[in-house]
Each structure stands twice: as structure tokens, then as C-alpha cells.
């Protein structure tokens, strides 16, 4: 693994290795024996979008592993926000830092940056992919279930970055994946081409009740990210009936897990009651962002 830009960068073996290392690092942190695997290493945390979990978990993770993490707002603190070409920023930061984490908009910009930087680059979220979040989801499921193989995962929501990454990651991990989206909100075409190679292990549906039937894990994410706008009003109409409620969860297995990448918009993609019922799973999922990202850093920079 040279970079982590999207889930399809990983082989099944590499994916499971990340989870294995994450579990080891989590146990070591709980025991107070975290190794200084990044001693003398520096990581640029470049963010073009706001962030709570991604920024803080990377900052804390780099620190816990003995490295230096520098946060920078790409829009207001770097010359790239004033028009400096991306290729120049990449070639400069690659000479200062051992690794760059970038949260940005366009996947093509991230991939161009990775080609030029000369150091490992990690996707902190683009409009196309959210691999760090999905690795945390898979870790959380494996901790609870003991295995990912054969588990039925149902994603309900917008077919954007979370759906794209969950589909690929779940299938690579040996899961059965169902994606439920309204018409007009399908996952990326290349992701669907990848998924259909897995035959009956993948289903794309528009009916949430059909999708959650006998699911081991249900995952949702916010789909109304610009409240008060015409786009928001359209989405509220289009996603009517896609809220994860207690009644919907009755169609899943009795012990089904429910995950949410956060932030959660209660009353939209998830009901407040269901969120609180599954809050421990959801916040364990959020905690596991720290551990999987430490694992990715340790693999890329310390050769684990």
C-alpha cells in the first residue's frame, strides 16, 4: 500500500491487515503501551472542508504514535487558497512532510496530489470516497461479530462517498452488501461496475424495508448537508421514507447493529430514539476512527 485514496486501492489481505493492526494498537492504547512508531515523523493535515472526527482523530493518533501532526486550513492558511497551483503545493509539502492527509472535494485533485507529492497521501474525505470511515465501520463490525465474512450489510441513504466506500470495502471484506438509495442518488458508475462482479453478494434497491430484511448491520449517513437551501428542500422530498426508524429496524435481525458516520441529523436520516438505542455502537465506531487511522499511518510510515 503506497497511499490510501479509495477502498479499491486495497486488496482483501491489505484490508484485513489494517484491521488487525488497528486492533493491536487499540489494545496497546488501553494498556498504556502505545509504541512510538512515528517518532521523528511529520504528518500534514490539510483540510479544505470542516471536520470534527477526522481532524481530531488524526491529530491525536499522530501524537500517540510519537509523531508531529500539523493542521492547516487549505482555504485560508495556504497559498493554494489564493490560487497557487495544486501541483506546486504537492511538491512543496512532499519535501517537508513524511505523509499528507487531505480532506477536499474532488477525488481527481487528491489523486493528482498523490502522484506529485512523493510521500504517502491519505484521503480524509472527498465527494467520492471516505475510506478511513469505512475502515472504522468494518473494525466495529468485526469487533462485535468476530468476522466480516458473510455478514449482511445494508446502507440506506445518498449514494455518495460513504456508499461508494462501503460497497467496495464490504465486498472486499467478504460481506453481502445492499445499498438502498432513492432514484437519482445512485452510487458512482465505476463502483457499481465493481460491485456487480460479485453477483448475488450485491444488491442496489430503492425500498428501505426490502433492503434491511435480515440485515446484520444497517448503516446510514446524513443526506441533508445544506439546510435552508432549495437543494435541501428537494432532498427532504426525495428522501421521504428513507429515515432509519425503530419500525424499519424491526425488519433487520433482532441483534442487528446500526452505524452512523456522524454528524447525525435526528429526524432526517435517523430517528432520535433509534440513534440513542444504538449510541454505544455509533460512538465506538467514532472511536475506531482513531485506531484504524493509526494503523494506516503505521503501515505507511513504519512498515508494519
Predicted regions mapped to residue ranges:
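Rossmann-like adenosine-cofactor binding region
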Residues: 196-273
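Active-site cofactor/substrate anionic-group-binding motifs, chiefly glycine-
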Residues: 42-43, 47-96
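Active-site-proximal loop->helix
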Residues: 70-93, 116, 166-169, 186-200
